[in-house]
Amino acid sequence: MENKKYYEELRILKGIAIILVVLGHSFSFTGFNILDNNILNRYIHDSIYSFHMPLFFMIAGFLTNNYEDNLNKKFYFSKIKRLLIPYIFINIVDAIPRHLFNSLVNNKSNSIERIIFYSGAATWFVYTLFLLFLIFPIIEKYIIKKDKYYLFGLGLFLLNIFEIGSNIKIFTVDRLVYMSFYFYIGYLLKNYYEKISGSVKKFNVIYIVIIILFILYGNFYNEFILSKIIFPFLGIISFWYISLKIKKVENLIYNFLTFCEENSLSFYLLEVFCGTVYRVILIKIIPIEYNFLLVLSFFSLKLISLVIGIKYMVCKNKYFSFLLGAKYKK
């Protein structure tokens, strides 16, 4: 990653975020509602969903170069290679078991129309991020760099407040509008990042208060439209602060999280397949009444399988690593 030595904490943060994606998806069991009957399940699920995807887009915006570097063939080719090819590959592969075993999956079909216009079966993040990378360099050149960056940010905020585009599913416009706000915040923050990260010690108490607020209220993010926009920052700041602490000690946790970060796209793309297999097995072994144990087992099996599969199979094969966005290691 460019400027890696300055942003190790962001690598750690992204590693934490992809693990939270795996955990968040572990609450999904076709035909069973394991959230409303268990307070702990609901709390963990909603706390994770309050911020984990905005976090990914915020980091992506932070790491975006200026339009002089982005408005060229090399930039767009890199995004096709990094995002579009894995997106197409995984959705084509995904379509096969969905048609053969449609009773075992949460989403029943993955047609060509859905892949092109509606982000596939479970890959909206990759689809939306790719579209954002396509349009943002143009927005940056013709709007942001014309000293209208505050107006653009205000415009994104108002679009979300009034939920404009929230019902438009084609090209994931609903998610594009929402996630663009966090992408843009990340883009703006990079100019002030060193000053902010350098002042952490001085404001330790404030960060601890934010963590406490996230623990107490993060799961209420979806109560109001304003809380849906503001509350994600509680989780983002809390885990950023934790990442800064982990960064200071290069131990097994550090190494594990950075591995997850550099292969986060593979984790995201392959998690659905692991989920389909283990969901069917576990629901027959563990009674639904023990739903927290069910979630914990589901999460653990998926994470262990993903780590082993990605480390020893995907990363070792140049074709798999290319098609799944992993870091190839001979």
Sequence positions of predicted segments:
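Alpha-helical transmembrane segments and their immediate juxtamembrane cytosolic regions
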Residues: 1-330
